[in-house]
């Protein structure tokens, strides 16, 4: 009977060692959970970006308005017969009334 109790205590000690400091231990589990959370957050951001790009592709395929808008904004193109005006902002000086 003593041998059986000693064997159980040794077995319990080995299991506790594996639980706290061996491979696949609890601290390692928590570190992996943090890595998974960070990776999931990155995946969510990439999924949002992919969705925006998919919508932009659909918009570009469906009509000419999106293409025209990109050409105007990114390439500075104008339609035939249009006049392009560039307004350059400068600093305004506020003059106070003289007394």
UniProtKB/Swiss-Prot annotation:
Membrane spanning residue stretches: 4-21
Entry's Gene Ontology BP terms: FtsZ-dependent cytokinesis
Coiled coil regions, renumbered to chain: 36-73
Compartments where located: Cell inner membrane
UniProt superkingdom: Bacteria
Xref: InterPro entries: Cell_div_FtsB, FtsL/DivIC
Subunit structure: Part of a complex composed of FtsB, FtsL and FtsQ.
Family to which the UniProt record says this protein belongs: Belongs to the FtsB family.
Matches recorded under NCBIfam families: PRK00888.1
Protein name: Cell division protein FtsB
Gene designation per UniProt: ftsB
